[in-house]
Amino acid sequence: MDMFLNKEDFFISCFNSKKIGDDAAIIGDWIVSKDAFFEDVHFKRKWFELDDIAYKSMIINISDSIAMNADPKYALLAVALPSSLSKPDIKKLYSGFKRAADEFGIEIIGGDTVSNIKIDITVTVLAKSKRVLRRVGLKTGDLLAYTGNLGSSKKALTSLLRYNNARKSSRFFKPELRQKFISKATSSLHCGMDISDGLFADLKKLSKANKLGFNFSNEIPKSIACSGEEYEMLVGFCPRKRKKMLRLAKAQRCELNIFAKARRKEYKLKCKAHHF
């Protein structure tokens, strides 16, 4: 297993909280998530327009709410800004935050700003859900599936690292969140999470949460399964729900790829962590 994920697991275990372990924490009626988006860790400034940096920093956090079938309501922003940024630059950042917030009906209610040599953004989203979708709940014999097409983000990242250029239509720049599908499907799903670190890496998290492994229907290329920052959904459901899931996905114009079955076996991670 990747060294960083070992350290991440160790760090999380130090807190010994039952609220940690899903895409977001459940506190009463609220679903609370936080994500960081740091320059030279998650992105390089030359890759993005400023408004796109702000937009993506919001979207990756909103994804955590949607992954738990929660409706995002409010957001808090912590933004570190270089002194070299002009007022028009800051206005561009604002427009990116607002674009994402407006898209999902979110009100930005506060936060903090500090000076820094790089752009670092941390977003907290508060959401509500009538029926929470969690990582825990997968059963032996359940089918595993992911939405959409994976691999675009890794392809774009490779191109950016080599040539400082990639198609702006790539999911690396603008992930597509599956809010409508998850809202319709949650009552028939046993578990779910978003694919942020890559399919194989996130399967490891699902395996750990449910103490199960997987039998794959076909070999999945690493170019697909090791592509992080896709923000598609990874879900598990009873085989009897197969036709219903495919029908729901089609109705929402969302491709659903069934690729494995849950089994009582060990699952070994086949990829390195996406960022580290």
Question: Which residues does each PLM region occupy?
Answer:
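Helix-biased detector of long, well-ordered alpha-helical tracts
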Residues: 1-276
